[in-house]
Amino acid sequence: MSKSGKKLTQKLKKNLPVTGPQAPTLYELMQWYCLNTNTHGCRRIVVSKGRLRRWIWISLTLCAVAVIFWQCALLLMSYYSVSASITVTFQKLVYPAVTICNLNPYSYSKVKDRLAALEKETSQTLKNIYGFTEPLIRSKRDVGVNVENSTEDIFLKQIPLYRLESVKGSQLVVSDLKTKKRTRMSAKVIHRDAESVQDPGNMVGFKLCDPKNSSDCTIFTFSSGVNAIQEWYRLHYTNILAKISMEDKIAMGYKADELIVTCFFDGLSCDARNFTLFHHPLYGNCYTFNSAERGNLLVSSMGGAEYGLKVVLYIDEDEYNPYLSTAAGAKILVHDQDEYPFIEYLGTELETATETSIGMQLTESAKLSDPYSDCTMDGRDVSVENLYNKKYTLQICLNSCFQREMVRSCGCAHYDQPLPNGAKYCNYEEYPSWIYCYFKVYKQFVQEELGCQSACRESCSFKEWTLTRSLAKWPSLNSEEWMLRVLSWELGEKLNKNLTKNDLANLNIFYQDLNSRSISESPTYNIVTLLSNFGGQLGLWMSCSMICVLEIIEVFFIDSFWVVLRQRWRNWWENRKENQAEDTPEIPVPTMTGHDNPLCVDNPICLGEEDPPTFNSALQLPQSQDSHVPRTPPPKYNTLRIQSAFQLETIDSDEDVERL
């Protein structure tokens, strides 16, 4: 083909009409898209010559589209899997708060007047069960309290003690530990120490009944009489303390200068003024070092045993309650300054006559909240009210939820948890059935029937101290004599006694190093990463950009919709016109003329046969109803032919150009 022919062909193709979105059919729309798209595969399908090449490009394009859908599905699954990555960093930190408690909550000499009747019944019960004599029980101290002789045991009457002798189905054979009377009864048995009873004759427990329904009773059994007596004593002890004011309980506890004998921090001397009072319902007066209530937080200058907190504690074992505290020593807890010290759950015990060295390592954790986890940032989105007025923790939420259910079900609050607004602590005088109700609510709480475990969530950010403990005998044999003499002389005015090593406990708590471990979560996939990966997959498999994606949306969704809609509208309109033409009746042409013509009845211009109409009057005459448009097809001229814009016909000669 000559150069002039090629130029003419290009000019004709350029000037041919391109319909695009206005294409009458989907086929022409797809053909226009494939010729004009930036996606190479679709264009090669149209312009390739030969059926084999065309099918190859169709297969490759479809495979690329399938791979894109597969990879994008994997990306979406990764995005909605809400996985998180963990970052570990190390940084320096301040010294934590350290709470110290004596295992004996109250000095016995200060509380014995309130517990005299309970102690009398307890010792008498032990004598009835095991044959203990009075001097054996009180060999280490003299109670020194005159208790009025009374034949009525009020504590055993409120909570009677039994020995479980045999179990036959639902029938129990028990013997009263006071009267030795055997009784057969029907009651539920709850084993506090074991799930099954191997030897019922060794089981000791107490019976609780619902005052409103005397037949509804439960016997709580223990595998050892020691545990049964302690639990029975603790219930009455709690009932007595619930009626004592906070001021009196603080006065009955240990003072800071009585508990803290010596103190050193970071190589410098400290004293009781560096400790803050914290009254615990179970451990009495506890003291917190570095609580941040007295000013700035303390910081360790270096890591190691020489730069931590060193204290010598006075345990005063002679003032221990024998039925309440069976272990002698102290209990400590390392915690953050704004956290409540749950020392009964997380505390570490210290032995007497022992030096306890504790190395600390802090780990700070920060989790992602919803949708990555079910944690809460500050507890405001938790339905349970915080009764502790401290930073939210899971344990605070669980205890607050239990106390709320206790008040709702029993009408009073348990002594171990803070008192809600408008509630009172449980006691026998005002709430006779509170113990039975307490065990019933506690059983529901343990079995997760109260909904507390589902309502409470973990905190997203928290601090955790890993403790490494080591023990050493203290003081040594060579230093015991002079050290105890010096300490006895310094505390002589307060103690009026010579100290022994069993009265003291030594604590050394320090950072192993000044680095802390920080664990934080970050989303593995976010919206930016998702879009970036989508773009990478489209560009890798189809050389497609965001503009190409918009083209696909425009052509395959918007333009295709309008093309189909126009086709349906055109078909409907043509069918409607054909139906109207078929339903229209043919009106015959009237043969009458002049005044006899019914068309001229109301027309004043109608003329007779003898009067030919003028030009103006003829224009005003009504038209004939049976006039038809001629349906003769137009002549076929070669000059009226129009070639399709998408016809890729080649022009090989000037004759073809002239023919076009």
Swiss-Prot record:
GO terms for cellular component: apical plasma membrane; plasma membrane; sodium channel complex. It comes from the Eukaryota. Originally identified and characterized by its inhibition by the diuretic drug amiloride. Keywords: Cell membrane, Disulfide bond, Ion channel, Ion transport, Membrane, Sodium, Sodium channel, Sodium transport, Transmembrane, Transmembrane helix, Transport. It is a multi-pass membrane protein. Signal peptide: none annotated. One of its GO terms (biological process) is sodium ion transmembrane transport. One of its GO terms (molecular function) is ligand-gated sodium channel activity. It is found in: Apical cell membrane. Residues 1-55, 559-660 are cytoplasmic. Component of the heterotrimeric epithelial sodium channel (ENaC) composed of an alpha/SCNN1A, a beta/SCNN1B and a gamma/SCNN1G subunit. This is one of the three pore-forming subunits of the heterotrimeric epithelial sodium channel (ENaC), a critical regulator of sodium balance and fluid homeostasis. ENaC operates in epithelial tissues, where it mediates the electrodiffusion of sodium ions from extracellular fluid through the apical membrane of cells, with water following osmotically. NCBIfam families: ENaC. Belongs to the amiloride-sensitive sodium channel (TC 1.A.6) family. SCNN1G subfamily. This is Epithelial sodium channel subunit gamma. The lineage of its organism: Eukaryota, Metazoa, Chordata, Craniata, Vertebrata.
